[in-house]
Curated annotation (Swiss-Prot):
This is Protein BIG GRAIN 1-like. The keyword Membrane applies. It comes from Oryza sativa subsp. indica. The keyword Transport applies. GO terms for biological process: auxin transport; auxin-activated signaling pathway; positive regulation of auxin mediated signaling pathway. Involved in auxin transport. Regulator of the auxin signaling pathway.
Amino acid sequence: MRDMEMRWAAPAPATRGRGRARRRAPDQPSFSSTLLDAICDSMDEGGEDGRTRNAASAAAKKRQEAANSYHYYYCYKPSLAASYRAAPALGSTADCPGRGYFSSSEVEYSLRRLRPIRTSAAGGAGDGAAVARKQRHEQPDVEKTAKTKPGSASARACRRPASPGARLASLLNSIFSGKRPSAQRPACSPDYPEPACSTAPPSSSSSYARRPCHAKTLRTPPTTTTTARARPSRSRTVRFLDIDGKVAVAAAVAGCRRIPVMEVEADTDDGGEESSDASSDLFELDSLAAIAPAGGRDGSHGDELPVYGTTGVGIRRDIGRRRPYGHAPCRSWSRAV
């Protein structure tokens, strides 16, 4: 216990000695005390000069911030960037705050170049009066041109699209006015006499001189509506005309003459012996060769096969003989021309 008390009690004199050694003389004050004394002295001694100096520094700082804000506003707005770039360089590069080559003086100059927008009532009234005066001066000219040029006004009116009501009114007027539209024309003219036509069949000699043509003549419709209603429209007709007229004259002189016409009848099967013989005799070449001659005049049909429908009993003898032109099982009749 006594040793512990001595251990705790021994350092006390040394601590006291150190504290005494750290104490400074009154002529050597500490850094914090000197700083505090300097601040107090500046506040007391400043007075009016200090206040004006602080106000000037604050104003300069505000102007710098405003210039910086205008710089950013002009640079990032496309509509005003051109006017900002077009401003002449009034200040030197030393005045630039460090953001490019623009200075605060350039920004102020560009701001002065902008024209304010007139929003006052007086300015609007003045503009309205000027516009009214212009309209008064221009109105007589418009009236003169409208009087001197009526055709141009009607042409402009025609160019405008018609409304549905106007279209309906024009349609009703055209219906009740009784005027026939120009598109409808009579099929043929009733004033011209009909030419004589020949109904005789064309012969081999005059067939090249005959050609089909339309007996239709177009002419303009009459001007009055009564004649147009009185004359009925005729249908279109097609006639065969003779160009030289020889056939028509000959037919008129000779009167009616009968021309034989051959009408070929179709073969009909009666189901008799002929059909059975015709179907069975197709392959009886030996009997056919015995009955038929050796050939025609030139012997060209001797080796040919028979044709279906020509191997009957009654017509076996005709095989190999040349038939005249137009010969066929038919009936002849004539018609009047």
